[in-house]
Amino acid sequence: MPRRREVPKRDVLPDPKFGSVELTKFMNALMVDGKKSVDERIVYGALEQTAKKVQGKEAIEVFNEAIDNAKPIVEVKSRRVGGANYQVPVEVRPSRRLALAMRWVRDAARKRGEKSMDLRLADELIDAAEGRGGAMKKREEVHRMAEANKAFSHFRF
């Protein structure tokens, strides 16, 4: 247990356009070198593209659906027992779930081949909302690892 005092969580303000705290957190995760204005332009541009491509749904709905679909339920953690390292499956805390989903969507969007980042992000959000794409692939991979190491789940933390 840490001996220092617990650091308080900082509240994140909702974004001005959609009023979503999750969207602000995603913007902060996407930000490079503290350039928030560039980041906002990318995210809002991506959401506009998403609204054009997906008919009958709001862009923020697609974003929320994409993040929810990408959230992992279980992951593996290394645990050393008697000189051997075991990959022990553990349930993911809700705050970490959100952070991992956002990170995976961001990384998958960066790896895509489209011309600009807002197009990449828009397509990745649409793919994740529909249950495919790089972020979903990463989630399935993590779940497969946990399933494969289910035998070591009695080595709980």
From Swiss-Prot:
Protein role: One of the primary rRNA binding proteins, it binds directly to 16S rRNA where it nucleates assembly of the head domain of the 30S subunit. Is located at the subunit interface close to the decoding center, probably blocks exit of the E-site tRNA.
The keyword Ligase is annotated on this UniProt entry: no
Keyword Chaperone: no
Assembly and oligomerization: Part of the 30S ribosomal subunit. Contacts proteins S9 and S11.
Keywords assigned by UniProt, alphabetized: Ribonucleoprotein, Ribosomal protein, RNA-binding, rRNA-binding, tRNA-binding
PROSITE patterns, A to Z: RIBOSOMAL_S7
NCBIfam families: rpsG_bact
CDD domains in UniProt: uS7_Bacteria
An annotated GO BP: translation
Pfam families in the cross-refs: Ribosomal_S7
Paired cysteines (S-S): none
InterPro entries listed in its UniProt record: Ribosomal_uS7, Ribosomal_uS7_bac/org-type, Ribosomal_uS7_CS, Ribosomal_uS7_dom, Ribosomal_uS7_dom_sf
MF term (GO), any: tRNA binding
Domain of life of the organism encoding this protein: Bacteria
Similarity comment: Belongs to the universal ribosomal protein uS7 family.
Any one of the GO CC terms: small ribosomal subunit
Name of the featured protein: Small ribosomal subunit protein uS7
PANTHER family from the UniProt entry: RIBOSOMAL PROTEIN S7
